[in-house]
Structure formats: C-alpha cells, structure tokens
Curated annotation (Swiss-Prot):
Signal peptide: none
Organism, scientific name: Xylella fastidiosa (strain 9a5c)
Keyword Ion transport: no
UniProt name for this protein: Large ribosomal subunit protein bL17
Disulfide bond annotation, renumbered to this chain: none
HAMAP family the UniProt entry points to: Ribosomal_bL17
Keyword Magnesium: no
GO BP terms in the entry: translation
Protein family: Belongs to the bacterial ribosomal protein bL17 family.
Pfam families: Ribosomal_L17
Length: 126
C-alpha cells in the first residue's frame, strides 16, 4: 500500500526523476523563468524552495549540501550569490506558478515557473 507516500512519479525511475528535477532547478536559477507542465511545476517547488532557504545562510556546509542536490557549480554560485541574499527577509514562497494554457500535441496543462522579485530586463521598443 502506498499510504502517505507524497510526490508524483511521472512514469520515471527514481534516478531519472531526480536528475530531471536537478536540471530543472538549475535552469530555473539560471534563467529565473522556465516553462514546463503544471504537475512538474508543482513538484519543482518542493525541490527548489528548500534549496533557496538553505542559501539564506552562506556557509561551506550549506554550499556542499546544495551541490550534492544540484550537481551544478554554476547554479550553486547563482543560488548563494544572488538568490540567497535576495530572499533573506522572505519566510518562504519564493516561486510563482502561472498557468499558460495547454500544449499543442498532447493538450498537457502548461505553466511558467517564475522566481519572485526577479529583475525585469526592459526591452527597447522601436
């Protein structure tokens, strides 16, 4: 029986699921905004938000814990240099999910995953 087993499986092995979310979190930290399916976006919050909470206190031990989960030096650097200091005063809820319709091929519900308080780059209008 699978009583009290939280989390979705996404028809993937444990290692594949872990690698997928590690890559998605690294992309989220790098680009501040990614587009994915709604169920993956909801599970992504469960992986990304504890890492941001960890990054609020910059220590060697916390950096090693973050690297063990992400396996990406660039993402760990961004996490501790930009995101940790940005959210020091916020007690949680660092990520916003915005539903954005359905995918063409299989009609899967899609969503944008966005970091709150991200810097908006203004594009020049000609």
């Amino acid at each position: 029986m699978r009583h009290q087993k939280s989390g979705r499986k996404f028809n993937r092995t444990d290692a594949h699921r872990g690698a997928m979310f590690s890559n998605m979190v690294a992309s989220l930290f790098k680009y501040q905004l990614i587009k994915t399916t709604l169920p993956k976006a909801k599970e992504l919050r469960r992986v990304a938000e504890p890492l941001i909470t960890l990054a609020k206190v910059d220590s060697v031990a916390n950096r090693r814990l973050a690297f063990a989960r992400l396996r990406n030096k660039e993402a760990v650097g961004i996490l501790f240099s930009n995101l940790g200091p940005r959210y020091v005063t916020r007690p949680g809820g660092y990520i916003r999910l915005l539903k954005c319709g359905f995918r063409h091929g299989d009609n899967a519900p899609m969503a944008y995953v966005e970091m709150l308080e991200r810097p908006i780059i203004a594009e020049e209008v000609t």
